[in-house]
């Protein structure tokens, strides 16, 4: 088995479509309005575009096709010219709003496209855009919208995901990049066939800010190499999604990301103070814009965030529609090497001479297999020569596994894996993230 196999779970089963039953509601949307949906509870909601033109976060809807939004979904169906939408099910919230920032977002896209045209004409690079703002203001949604609009114009932009708590490119606890070649699927998002993913190990950058900044620099370096060899990627530029930590070390991480990627444009959502701070601290040639958040962006509870992270991991193993079948098998303790990136903080007086706490943050600490590893998510980092510990924290991962069981008597681990045994020659990096496989 090659290491690439880990990125694609096993054979798929026929999709079982959900029948259009339950209460039905028809919405007549006027031009430049949007139907906002929030789906909680346990039942999905289905939507169909009956007439007119409409889109979801920049992806055009196909007329007379039913789209399913599962529990936990939040969506906005926007129309530039007016449309009729049929809805089946009982969402927690469904209303039409005229108060939308879509015209401002479209103007932003027009400006970015003008920069791409100029880059094409003058042999320069395209716009590198960093999207910043506190939590729950719609940063990921704005990135998705601008990426979709760029692709619809024939571009091939790169999505750079620095939000370790969300994981739109891969699972939570990772950082990564994805070349976007087609608009996001309304139900499943962007196709992640060959993402570049790095292990971080936690959902909060503050747990290891040294590693976070190092991986940010690594992503920027790899993106620069791609732009050097691919003119279309260079002209198309990138959209960088950041986390909602915008104070203290979080703010410094934003400045570091802007510097590492040499961004041309910074879009700040819904926080004037952050906008003014970045305007002051970034180079004068960086265009910094303040944009309003959508009225549909609302604060999520800790429970909602946890469920969203669980869903992202579940989708990795089982697919967005639950139609994939991962593999379960046992391996012996002696067959694996497990590490954690970053040693526990200890007093400076106890550190070796000349070593700092920051050095400690990048140290690989061996983890002895035991019961406390149960249900942890682990990154699979393939070994292609060299020592096991050499630069492991900067290597891209091949995929992920979950330890579903630990037998200390038999010295075995039971794994949930998207690919069958055996594991490739690899090192496993353990995350703080746990996943209970209840399927």
Curated annotation (Swiss-Prot):
Homology family: Belongs to the Clp1 family. Clp1 subfamily.
EC number: 2.7.1.78
GO molecular function, one term: ATP-dependent polydeoxyribonucleotide 5'-hydroxyl-kinase activity
Keyword tRNA processing: yes
EC category name: transferase
Tagged with keyword Kinase: yes
Main location: nucleus
Disordered: annotated segments: 1-29
Annotated residues for binding of ATP: 34, 74, 136-141
General function of this protein: Polynucleotide kinase that can phosphorylate the 5'-hydroxyl groups of double-stranded RNA (dsRNA), single-stranded RNA (ssRNA), double stranded DNA (dsDNA) and double-stranded DNA:RNA hybrids. dsRNA is phosphorylated more efficiently than dsDNA, and the RNA component of a DNA:RNA hybrid is phosphorylated more efficiently than the DNA component. Plays a role in both tRNA splicing and mRNA 3'-end formation.
Bias kind Polar residues: ranges: 14-24
Gene Ontology terms: biological process: cerebellar cortex development; global gene silencing by mRNA cleavage; mRNA 3'-end processing; RISC complex assembly; tRNA splicing, via endonucleolytic cleavage and ligation
Quaternary structure, from the entry: Component of the tRNA splicing endonuclease complex. Component of pre-mRNA cleavage complex II (CF-II).
SUPFAM superfamilies from the UniProt entry: P-loop containing nucleoside triphosphate hydrolases
A Pfam entry, by short name: Clp1
Reactions accelerated catalytically: a 5'-end dephospho-2'-deoxyribonucleoside-DNA + ATP = a 5'-end 5'-phospho-2'-deoxyribonucleoside-DNA + ADP + H(+); a 5'-end dephospho-ribonucleoside-RNA + ATP = a 5'-end 5'-phospho-ribonucleoside-RNA + ADP + H(+)
Localisation: Nucleus
Keyword list, A-Z: ATP-binding, Kinase, mRNA processing, Nucleotide-binding, Nucleus, Transferase, tRNA processing
Name this polypeptide is given: Polyribonucleotide 5'-hydroxyl-kinase Clp1
InterPro entries linked to this entry: Clp1, Clp1/Grc3, Clp1_C, Clp1_C_sf, Clp1_N, Clp1_N_sf, CLP1_P, P-loop_NTPase
Domain of life: Eukaryota
Originating gene: clp1
Cellular component GO terms, alphabetical: mRNA cleavage factor complex; nucleus; tRNA-intron endonuclease complex
């Amino acid at each position: 088995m090659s290491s690439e196999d880990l990125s694609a779970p096993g054979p798929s089963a026929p999709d079982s479509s959900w029948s259009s039953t339950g209460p039905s509601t028809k919405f007549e949307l006027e031009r430049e309005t949007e139907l906002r949906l929030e789906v909680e509870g346990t039942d999905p909601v289905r939507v169909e575009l009956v007439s007119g033109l409409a889109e979801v976060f920049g992806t055009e809807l196909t007329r007379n096709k039913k789209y399913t939004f599962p529990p936990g979904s939040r969506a906005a169906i926007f129309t530039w010219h007016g449309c009729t939408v049929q809805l089946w099910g009982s969402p927690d919230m469904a209303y039409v709003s005229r108060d939308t920032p879509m015209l401002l977002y479209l103007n932003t896209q027009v400006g970015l496209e003008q920069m791409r045209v100029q880059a094409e004409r003058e042999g320069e690079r395209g716009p590198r855009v960093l999207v910043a703002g506190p939590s729950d203001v719609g940063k990921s949604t704005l990135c998705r919208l601008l990426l979709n609009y760029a692709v619809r114009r024939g571009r091939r932009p790169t999505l750079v995901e620095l939000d370790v708590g969300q994981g739109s490119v891969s699972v939570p606890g990772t950082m990564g990049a994805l070349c976007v070649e087609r608009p996001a699927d309304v139900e499943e998002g962007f196709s992640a066939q060959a993402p570049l993913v790095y292990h971080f190990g936690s959902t909060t950058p503050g747990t290891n800010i040294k590693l976070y900044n190092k991986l940010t620099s690594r992503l920027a370096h790899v993106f620069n190499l791609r732009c050097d060899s691919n003119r279309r990627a260079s002209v198309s530029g990138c959209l960088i999604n950041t986390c909602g930590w915008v104070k203290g070390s979080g703010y410094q991480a934003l400045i570091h990301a802007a510097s590492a990627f040499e961004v041309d444009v910074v879009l700040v959502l819904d926080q004037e103070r952050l906008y003014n701070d970045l305007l002051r601290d970034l180079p004068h040639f960086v265009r910094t814009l303040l944009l309003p958040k959508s009225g549909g962006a609302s604060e999520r509870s800790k429970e909602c965030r946890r469920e969203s992270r669980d869903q992202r991991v579940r989708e990795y193993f089982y697919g967005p529609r639950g139609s994939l079948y991962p593999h379960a098998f046992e391996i012996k303790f002696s067959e694996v090497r497990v590490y954690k990136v970053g040693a526990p903080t200890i007093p400076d007086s106890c550190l070796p001479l000349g070593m700092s706490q920051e050095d400690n943050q990048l140290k690989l600490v061996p983890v002895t297999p035991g019961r406390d590893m149960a249900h942890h998510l682990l990154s699979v980092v393939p070994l292609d020569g060299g020592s096991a510990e050499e630069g492991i924290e900067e290597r891209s991962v091949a995929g992920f596994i979950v330890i579903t069981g630990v037998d200390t008597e038999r010295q075995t681990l039971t794994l949930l894996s998207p690919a069958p045994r055996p594991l490739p020659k690899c090192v496993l990096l353990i995350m703080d993230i746990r996943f209970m496989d209840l399927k």
